Amino acid sequence: MNSIKLPRTIHIGGKGQVKKLTLGGTSPILLQTMWKESLLGADLLSIVKSLNELEQLGCDIVRFAVPDMDSAEQFVKLTRLTEMPLVADIHFDYKLALRCMDGDTAKIRINPGNIGSKEKTEEVIRKAKDTGTAIRIGVNSGSLPSDLKKKIEEANSKRNLSGDKKALDDEISLLRADTLTEAAARELEIFEKADFKDAVVSMKASNVRETVMANEIFAKKFDNPLHLGVTEAGPLIQGIVKSTIAFYRLLEQNIGSTIRVSLSDSCENEVIAGREILTECGKRQGGIRLISCPRCGRKGFDVQAFVKRWQTKLLSEKKDISIAVMGCVVNGPGEGKHADLGITGAEDSVIIFKHGAITKRLDLKKLTEEEKIKAVDKAFIEELQSL
């Protein structure tokens, strides 16, 4: 059985004021998200502010859709305003990739299923070499080359005529994974002939099983760094579940150099989800680990409201500590005593504790709801800052 290859090391960014990042090898796994809005008419300084906030949450790279030349012009301007390494997501028109590389672009993402002829890809590679820009070959199950699509269509036709659909389903899943790998391999051949070494690869299906199989097959044959993701993963809960299953299975085998949790939700939630997955898989250390109880009828403290109010701020902190937010005195400070800092409540009082020892009690009986929130937040921030 072929073993997983250690991915080659490549560098992205480093132009202008953009941070230089190391990808692959034994480097930490990088966390990405994708900007959710059009660049057309956008306030670029406002985007820079948002990029800074995403960085505080733990984001390393942000990708932007560049569907037309006006968007490419905006993208080039944006690359010169931020330290965040930016990726231009290009489909159909290779000239958009060429224009984006005039900026301080960290990486270009192209899709071999729709970028056009080999000659167009070669022109993109030449400019990438000249400008020191990495390229991601992004293969999606929905946009495979026509001959590979035909293979899958023929297999599906046989399945519809078969009595043993389950057996054929397994074969078709493997075939789909193979076609994703084949599409990537074909494109890589062009890159290798051009002696272009800074190529990252991604192979994504909306099906977890096929995504995992494709990346496993690829990682045994090639040493290009892999970007992991499940395409069209879905809304918040479904998307996180799919991504977590796929990433865990791959990261446990040391497959993957970057990840993105694709969600029909905010960039912030993509980053938070990705960060938590990396932490729980033992692939990222540091930062605040937020623990909270699921709530029940005993609750004396509104865990949900407190977490909603504090989550982004806490996850932006660089302190390497754990914080427990517990709904009642059963869970805190007793079950939360392992935490560096914790908070809970009982009736009209709030308790703040460190390593299970109570450090502060607040009597909220005579306060309005607004005053209660202010008092709790003030006491909590004081204890947090003391750590």
From Swiss-Prot:
It catalyses: (2E)-4-hydroxy-3-methylbut-2-enyl diphosphate + oxidized [flavodoxin] + H2O + 2 H(+) = 2-C-methyl-D-erythritol 2,4-cyclic diphosphate + reduced [flavodoxin]. SUPFAM superfamilies: Nitrite and sulphite reductase 4Fe-4S domain-like. Gene3D superfamilies: Dihydropteroate synthase-like, Sulfite Reductase Hemoprotein, domain 1. Keywords: 4Fe-4S, Iron, Iron-sulfur, Isoprene biosynthesis, Metal-binding, Oxidoreductase. Its EC number is 1.17.7.3. Belongs to the IspG family. This is 4-hydroxy-3-methylbut-2-en-1-yl diphosphate synthase (flavodoxin). It comes from Treponema denticola (strain ATCC 35405 / DSM 14222 / CIP 103919 / JCM 8153 / KCTC 15104). The gene is ispG.
